[in-house]
Amino acid sequence: MIDVIMTGELLKTVTRAIVALVSEARIHFLEKGLHSRAVDPANVAMVIVDIPKDSFEVYNIDEEKTIGVDMDRIFDISKSISTKDLVELIVEDESTLKVKFGSVEYKVALIDPSAIRKEPRIPELELPAKIVMDAGEFKKAIAAADKISDQVIFRSDKEGFRIEAKGDVDSIVFHMTETELIEFNGGEARSMFSVDYLKEFCKVAGSGDLLTIHLGTNYPVRLVFELVGGRAKVEYILAPRIESE
């Protein structure tokens, strides 16, 4: 049996993070907490979600268990939940997930985990540049770039970290120096990425959330968000766009 209680804010954050890429997911209730990971149908991006046991108000599991969840359905339900609500998730059998908050109880049919696409292996990436910044600033930069182009260049060197977008007639550069960043190692890297994916990723975060970017040259980027006051970690890995000569 699974019986856990979490804040509405935590549930909304997790569901938003996962539905950015997939509509169904395997959710693992482990001794150390909740874990999920999935790759989008185009094999361009991966999401990895971890919520430590201590981030829950209550975390009771008889044994480690994996369930298959219709994340779109849970996301729809989460729209009715306030960030301050306490939400209880109960799994008593293989077929049903109960979602309880206030005087409301939803019963959601579970999916056979084996019917959900196999979970991806997390790639081992040696990426030279590490940038730590406020997620809200990153979100503003991506929103601005979206008005110019459908792709952006992330660039890191000793001068700082830049996000660049160029359209037919307009261009934009977002630049933060080492002193403006929370942490920066000055590593040299440059890659191009899809704005559409980045916009979806940004929806989980806001001002005050922490974002760590691990960047290489023509390599996937790792975007690690520390959310809900550090109680949840959401990581996205996004493949680069190959630039034409």
From Swiss-Prot:
Keyword Glycosyltransferase: no
PROSITE patterns attached to this UniProt entry: PCNA_1
GO BP: leading strand elongation; regulation of DNA replication
Keyword Cytoplasm assigned: no
GO molecular function, one term: DNA binding
Gene3D superfamilies (UniProt xref): 3.70.10.10
CDD domains: PCNA
Keywords recorded for this protein, A-Z: DNA replication, DNA-binding
InterPro entries documented for this protein: DNA_clamp_sf, Pr_cel_nuc_antig, Pr_cel_nuc_antig_C, Pr_cel_nuc_antig_CS, Pr_cel_nuc_antig_N
Family: Belongs to the PCNA family.
Stated role: Sliding clamp subunit that acts as a moving platform for DNA processing. Responsible for tethering the catalytic subunit of DNA polymerase and other proteins to DNA during high-speed replication.
Subunit structure: Homotrimer. The subunits circularize to form a toroid; DNA passes through its center. Replication factor C (RFC) is required to load the toroid on the DNA.
Protein name: DNA polymerase sliding clamp
Encoding gene (name): pcn
